Amino acid sequence: NKYTPYTSTGTWTPKVTKVVKGGEMKEFKLEFADNADFKNAKTVVTNLKGEIITTADGGKSQTLSFDKIEYKLDQLNKLPTDSTGRGASKTFTYYVREQQPTTPFTNYKYDQSIYQITVNAVDNTDHKINVTATYKQIQDRDGNEVTTDTDHNLTDSTPTFTNTYSTSLPLSGMSGVTLTYLAGAAVLCAAAAWMHIRRKANAKGGERRE
């Protein structure tokens, strides 16, 4: 009898959801990589001719898929007790984010989140590799590092990146100037109102003296 080596395979397709609030869906690019520096990252772009769902709050949503990843038995770590590879397993780590363009769309605030994806691939001893993925947010949408906690562990299978459109958003780097201007304007208005009240009070006082 000819010996046939034991083999098994499994697949997993990483997905993301792109959401826009307050505006229309544009061509946004998302990146997927097996390293935190996103070297040689795979990319997907929102499809303006594809299915775009309108959410309950009026936003626009589209789910995108990266290329399918295939796992083979020789990629996994065999059990010391089974040289055939049955029951072998391995953990893989990936990262996903939205690409921040050098020329962003006007009045859109981009989501700067980064998610770390942990994929567990386990041979089920019946020629199939079972693949499960868990997601953890490691950078929030404002670009800040997320501290270690459980609030950013996701139970769903599609990390969501939300961009916000607003004509009232200050231009990048101008928020401080805008706030200073508004504060100064408020002070001037208050001073003008106080002077107007003083003039009316003085005028009434003059009339009484006559």
Question: Where on the chain are the PLM-derived regions?
Answer:
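Solvent-exposed loop/turn and edge beta-strand elements of beta-rich ligand-binding domains
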Residues: 1-210
